[in-house]
């Protein structure tokens, strides 16, 4: 499977890769090209032919399309992922649709993964076929007790199969980070399954949240796309210290990138 070319666990868009259309209208360079990627993936998934290799290829195509629209990617810390044996729980903030599309090409070269996602994402036309094929854990974000049970039970099963979980412990994706809205569900799962946590921080508001349709907002190449992965953490006792360390990691990176953190 082909992925992003890494140098010492990092990737940076090497130069301005904007197409002619991207220089005129980033959104016009991006959306008309991303829809065929989604439709092809959905068709393959519906036929039961969408595997990890196809997922990574689709994700890479989205990343390259972003770059042609003018976006710059800056990814660091993948040496921590590469050196960790066995499955883990990836825990980070959630900002836009971008991370759902791009994280697979970042992580699949090292780990089999799936996501904890909202049930509504599973029910989407076309893209829902893609998500269901990845065997995610679906939560309603309405009943916290039911969501906790789904993540604890479903997460243990998948981790037992060697599949790592990507968890966004927030109720929704938002451009600013509020530590008070960042729950402990990922840490609890890692503790129960006895696997490490890899914290990650991201700033993906180059793909904005739309006013009418949240998934399709403004494409703003002036905002660099950042991903940073931290050193693995082993959860001890009830996980309070590790939870705070994850928050600290996210806050430090967001502030360094010029992101918004609610104090």
Task: Give residue ranges: language-model regions.
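Active-site metal-binding loops of divalent metal-dependent hydrolases
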Residues: 171
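Short, glycine/acidic-rich beta->alpha junctions
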Residues: 95, 99, 147, 178-182
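Residue-level preference for the first positions of well-ordered beta-strands
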Residues: 87-89, 162-168
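Membrane-anchoring hydrophobic helices of lipid-metabolizing enzymes
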Residues: 1-87, 102
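Membrane-interfacial amphipathic helices and adjacent loop/beta segments
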Residues: 47-78, 111-153
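Hydrophobic/aromatic ligand-binding patch that stacks against planar heteroaromatic rings
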Residues: 106, 130, 157, 188-189
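Catalytic core of membrane glycerolipid acyltransferases/transacylases, capturing the structured
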Residues: 29-44, 84-143
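A cross-family acyltransferase "interaction/gating" segment
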Residues: 77, 127-128, 164, 175-241
């Amino acid at each position: 499977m082909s992925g992003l070319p890494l140098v010492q666990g990092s990737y940076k868009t090497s130069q301005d890769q904007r197409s002619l259309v991207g220089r005129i209208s980033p959104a016009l360079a991006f959306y008309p090209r991303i829809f065929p990627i989604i439709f092809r993936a959905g068709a393959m998934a519906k036929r039961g032919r969408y595997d990890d290799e196809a997922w990574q290829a689709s994700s890479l195509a989205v990343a390259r399309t972003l770059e042609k629209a003018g976006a710059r990617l800056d990814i660091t810390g993948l040496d921590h992922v590469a050196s960790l044996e066995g499955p883990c729980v990836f825990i980070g903030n959630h900002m836009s649709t971008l991370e759902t599309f791009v994280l697979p090409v970042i992580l699949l070269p090292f780990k089999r993964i799936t996501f904890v996602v909202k049930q509504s994402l599973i029910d989407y036309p076309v893209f829902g076929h893609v998500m269901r094929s990845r065997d995610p854990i679906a939560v309603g974000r309405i009943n916290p007790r039911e969501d906790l049970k789904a993540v604890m039970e479903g997460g243990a099963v998948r981790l037992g199969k060697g599949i790592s979980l990507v968890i966004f412990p927030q109720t929704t994706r938002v451009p600013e980070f509020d530590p008070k809205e960042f729950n402990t569900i990922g840490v609890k799962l890692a503790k129960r399954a006895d696997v490490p946590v890899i914290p990650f921080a991201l700033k993906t508001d180059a793909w904005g949240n739309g006013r009418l349709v949240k998934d399709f907002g403004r494409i703003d190449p002036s905002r660099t796309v950042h991903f940073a992965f931290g050193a693995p953490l082993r959860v001890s006792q009830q996980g309070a210290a590790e939870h705070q360390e994850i928050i600290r990691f996210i806050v430090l990176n967001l502030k360094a990138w010029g992101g918004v953190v609610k104090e």
